[in-house]
Amino acid sequence: AQRDKQYDQYYDRHIRDQRSKDFYNSPEWAAARLMVLIRDKYLCQVCLREKRITHTMTVHHIIPIREAWERRLDLDNMEATCPACHNAERRRG
C-alpha cells in the first residue's frame, strides 16, 4: 500500500504533469479550445450565470483532466471563463 501511494505521488508529480503539458501544447487542445470559445462567444460562462458580461480567451475543464483524462477533449466538459473565475474554479476543485 505504501509503495502504491509513493508511485501515485510520483506519477502525479512527474508523468501526469508532463502529459498535461504535452496536451496543452497539442493541436487537438488548440482546436477544442477554439471551438469552446466560439460556442461561448468568448464570454465567461461563470460571469454570465451571475448576470455579468466578461470577455475572455481562457477555457476551463469543469472536471479537471487529472481526474478525468478521457474527457480532456469533451466540449461538454469545458467552458470559457475569465482568468479570475478560472482561478477560483481551480482552487475549488
PLM region descriptions:
Residues 1-31, 48-53:
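A boundary/linker detector
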Residues 2, 49-52, 78-93:
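Short Cys/His-centered divalent metal-binding micro-motifs
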Residues 20-21, 59, 70:
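Generic secondary-structure boundary/loop-capping signal
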Residues 28-58, 82-84:
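Short cysteine-rich loop/turn motifs with clustered Cys
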Residues 62-63, 88:
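Alpha-helical hydrophobic packing sites
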Residues 63-78:
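Short linker/helix segments within small regulatory modules
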